[in-house]
């Protein structure tokens, strides 16, 4: 295989750049002499910071600009947080690598209180996620959920300024950026089921670029990929973008996958849950099965209501 340069399309946020640098280091470690450069760019989701994500359009909000760079041959691969990656790809592009997953749980961050349970009634909790909001309010309907956008540093600064009593963030992002000490407590997946793909990094590239596929192979983590495939299949069957109150989380039990799924009203009034097990080779079918269970319980009506409020399909 000839030595070549790989250009990585990435968003400019600190977390996105960390993920791109991680992939760069792994590629250079796996392939001596390979030149890897970053091509930072701004996504639509990065520009629109004054509105809840659910209101500004769900699918592909953080990836479209990166995909355009791949299609225009301005970059060779794009590095994404898997929870932001739409289910379908533009013609000529595909997902060819999923890296090993970091901690997939949600993190409770507060300067005053030790845990979600310790928050007094009426406490203000910051999150931009309808998934987190639905599960939080189902457990603690006495809390106030307040909109929170911006990068990790911005969100922590808003907490430190006293705008919130606590905020909920992905543990993976805090760990990767060196803010592990800011995690007051991690929230069990039993109490806050993660978003599909949360904590995993995916790599998208051109479908025809087989040399790139081969270079990415050492970074692919099969155990993570099988879990994420099941989660994404559930999301796809529910027509879920990254900004809907859908949660799903798969774990490996030997050669079996156990997938849990959840759809909730943002008010926390109704939470639908389902789970099933299947051989890991049937990951995609498992995702569809759990999604069908949720649909049978009435998930479609909840999701239609959310999409209607957001003003997009």
From Swiss-Prot:
Lineage per the UniProt record: Bacteria, Pseudomonadati, Pseudomonadota, Gammaproteobacteria, Pseudomonadales
First and last residue of the signal peptide: none
Protein name: Porphobilinogen deaminase
Disulphide bonds in the chain: none
UniProt xrefs under PROSITE patterns: PORPHOBILINOGEN_DEAM
Main EC class the enzyme belongs to: transferase
Keyword annotations of the record: Porphyrin biosynthesis, Transferase
GO biological process assignments: protoporphyrinogen IX biosynthetic process
Enzyme Commission number: 2.5.1.61
GO CC terms, sorted: cytoplasm
UniProt GO MF annotations: hydroxymethylbilane synthase activity
